[in-house]
Regions:
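A short, Lys/Arg-rich alpha-helix, primarily the initiator
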Residues: 1-17
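Short alpha-helical elements of helix-turn-helix
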Residues: 5, 9, 33, 49-52
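Key DNA-contacting residues within the recognition helix of helix-turn-helix
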Residues: 12, 37-38, 67
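Short, Lys/Arg-enriched C-terminal cap helix and immediately downstream tail that follows
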Residues: 14, 48-49
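Alpha-helical residues within the helix-turn-helix
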Residues: 16, 27, 57
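Short alpha-helical DNA-recognition segment
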Residues: 20-38
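DNA major-groove recognition helix of helix-turn-helix/homeodomain DNA-binding modules
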Residues: 50-65
Length: 68
């Protein structure tokens, strides 16, 4: 799946909309806090589809909404 970096802005926006910290999103999605930091900072340029699905599920949105 090629999502480019469109997920970066959406991820932060959706997390902030829920008023969640990075720690909370990491806990709710089941991914490590350090991985989430790397994703949000762009150090992980192409997160695995499985990771994006976990994040979308935790945020209560479709994968399409996360990466669009």
């Amino acid at each position: 799946m090629s999502s480019g970096n469109s997920y970066l802005k959406n991820l932060k926006k959706l997390r902030n909309k829920k008023d969640w910290t990075q720690e909370r999103l990491a806990r709710e999605s089941g991914i490590s806090f350090h991985t989430l930091i790397k994703i949000e900072s762009g150090r992980i340029k192409n997160p695995r589809l499985e990771t994006l699905i976990k994040l979308a599920k935790a945020l209560g949105v479709s994968i399409d909404k996360l990466v669009s």
